[in-house]
Amino acid sequence: GRFVSAALAQVPHLRAMLFDLPPVAELARARLASQGLAGRVTVHGGSFFDDALPGGADVATLVRVLFDHDDEHALAILRAVAAALPPGGTLLVAEPMADAPGAHAMGDAYFGFYLLAMGRGRARSFAEFSALLRAAGFDRIDRLRSRAPLLTGVITATR
């Protein structure tokens, strides 16, 4: 819920939906309510792999979600998001990237150790993300400039 609360703080007229695993969704619901944001965000508990994502959004975000999963599961998540977005809807992906501009070796080493410790997932290059996004039904894929390229790369894609 941290990304949602930050986005809502920046854009006063914005309304949001949050989808996360049920225990995380409950924590987010309580946190957002304590920040006075309950009236601007609808929280849904579920799993990308078992439940349909709620529809009705123009933009979906995946923030540090895909790098925890292998390609098969990452593609399943992207397909679920594509199914929930209307034609012309936008996906914003903020993830560690294997080819961080200006920090290739350092970023690859950092996330290599992180993912080794986690025992799963991987950082992907922009080309690898683009291939997964296309396979899930997205096009107009762009890499945006990030203020912290070592930690996060940002990609937009249109359904």
Q: Language-model features: where?
A:
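Alpha-helical subdomain
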Residues: 2-159
